[in-house]
Amino acid sequence: MATEINMPMGPGPLGEAGSLKIDTGSNMEVSIPSPVSAAPGELNETPSPSTPANPNSASRRPPRKSTLTQQQKNQKRQRATQDQLTTLEQEFAKNPTPTATVRDRIAEEINMTERSVQIWFQNRRAKIKLMAKKSLETGEDIDSIPESMRTYLAMQAMESGKGFPGAFLGRGMMPYGHGNMLMAGEQGGPSKVVIHHLTCRSLSIGKWTRVGQNTMDLIVFYSPDKCTMTYYINNEQAGYKIEYHFSCIKSICVENADDPTKVGGIVIELNRPPSFFMDQSPTSNGFFQCGDFTEDQQASQCLVHHLGGNPKVLSGQLAKLVSLESFMNRHNTMAYHPDPMAHGGMPVSAPVSPTNRPSSQPNFAQPHVGLFQESQWGISPAHHVMRGPGHKRQRSRSVPIAVDFSMLQTPMPSFYIQHPGEAQPQPHSPNIYAPVPQQPHALSPAGPGLRIDTQAGFGLDMRQYPMSATTAPSPSEYNSPSFFSQAPENTPLPASNFNTPYSSTFLSPMMNATNLNVPQSVSPISFSGGDPAIVDQSPPMSMLGRSASADIYHGGDSSAISDDGHSLNDMYSKHAITLPMHPPHSPAFVEPSQAELDMNQLVQFDTVDPSSLSPESVHQGIGGQ
């Protein structure tokens, strides 16, 4: 089967499409239309099926924009001239991502098509990205990257969540006024500088307003590591920056626009004017500090900045900013700073605690602003510093915390509040870790001369299990300090008639046990005597209640851990025990004249002969039968 292809050597008549005639030998012809060569003068006119025949209607709709490149228009390969390249380089230095309107203006100036200008910018951005990637490995060609392109690369790195080398950012990203301006050209190597973007479309300071037409016209970002907020503004052939430290921020909040005519966004109030910088690339090498470039110097007089944008988007971005530790401690002059040259060019050591404390003691957390700060343990509010980055040290649970008991030897209120304005650090005592050993002794007689023993009495241990080796049931070698005035320690404990356990109301099987007689506590602690000096500014201890249930265990049982299975530690080893105490004048107290009820009166047991329980007596009874 033969196939013949007939191709005409020239195009058909104008308006008639040429064809390829294929003879397949099976009486079937296939006609394929061939492209029509347009006249050279008709390159800019792209035929459209929707073009109306009426010329009046054609004037209403603008003609479709040409997508031809300069080579397609001239039908030959052509390179850009030196003047065209110079103009393109200058425009790229100002803004690497121009809009279609800007590209049309550039194309008219240099006599190129808009499509050719767009392709040149795309190729230039790709070349700069490749150059920046190689510069990370070799450290070369960093100075050849324009400042605007560095900001563009930083924005892309921020949006992707990756770090960006600080060497690309030059002096523009470094905080001024902290000694870093002199170190801008002395960076040993590229370091990661992470910036976060605030999606803002406008900036208003007083009567001066800037509105971003594209991505590079207005960029608002902050650096958590440098603790700076920056507004980058691109105008014509120069870039401008307004920058200030976190410590300059007095207040910051999100404003929702209730009025449709107003724009919502972030409102920032400063406590001092910001710093101003400008960059006239490529004539200058990076940003340099300048005066206030706003209209009538509004930014130096008005300290309220309004960043317009979507409140929903900005609220999430602002929440991330205010949660930063560097932002929360922005007004702390002794805050941790990662740069050793940040404070006057002098090296700063790590924060040192004003008191000598063991390594197992935890760091003192900074109290809430609304609370009074106590300085009775030797910690002054002026010494509260921000913890540096790293692992927070935790106190060992098996080692008791060190407390300066020497301050407690003198009478003092139990609720001692020191106002921040009167904070005075207490002198450190060398005896804080060397208490005087004392021998165990019995409780002193009831009265103001009570001395508290650290050993758990009455066989009741309020501590939770498991316990460490430091809580073994051994006699306490180091007793508590003298909270109250002491009495002779050799005075014996007065005899007491302790009640039987089943006469207590909390163990009674009666349904209405509150009507029973609740015997008064015979504890050696006195609730009717004079209050000791340590609670002279506190509620009187006689108002605290004490029930006879607290005396269920006799004073002779002094073991910290019970050996038998009947103590409350075995019954409620996993729960905290709270025993109520009721004084005679408490509403829960019942008069002694009411009826008494003993457990023996409720349950009667027959008399059992002990000899009848012997196996021998049972065996004899069976044998007798």
Curated annotation (Swiss-Prot):
It is found in: Nucleus. GO terms for biological process: cell differentiation. Residues 73-132 bind DNA. The keyword Zinc does not apply. Residues 1-83, 466-496 are annotated as: Disordered. Residues 467-496 have a biased composition (Polar residues). Keywords: DNA-binding, Homeobox, Nucleus, Transcription, Transcription regulation. SUPFAM superfamilies: Homeodomain-like. SMART domains: HOX. Gene3D superfamilies: Homeodomain-like. The keyword DNA-binding applies. GO terms for cellular component: nucleus. Residues 46-59 have a biased composition (Low complexity). Its main location: nucleus. Disruption phenotype: Leads to increased expression of the pyriculol/pyriculariol biosynthesis cluster highly reducing polyketide synthase PKS19. One of its GO terms (molecular function) is DNA-binding transcription factor activity, RNA polymerase II-specific. Pfam families: Homeodomain, PH_TRF2_HOY1. InterPro entries: HD, Homeobox_CS, Homeobox_DNA-bind_prot, Homeodomain-like_sf. PANTHER family: HEMATOPOIETICALLY-EXPRESSED HOMEOBOX PROTEIN HHEX, HOMEOBOX PROTEIN HHEX. Transcriptional regulator; part of the gene cluster that mediates the biosynthesis of pyriculol and pyriculariol, two heptaketides that induce lesion formation upon application on rice leaves but are dispensable for pathogenicity. With TRF1, negatively regulates the expression of the gene cluster and the subsequent pyriculol and pyriculariol production. This is Pyriculol/pyriculariol biosynthesis cluster transcription factor 1. It comes from Pyricularia oryzae (strain 70-15 / ATCC MYA-4617 / FGSC 8958). The lineage of its organism: Eukaryota, Fungi, Dikarya, Ascomycota, Pezizomycotina.
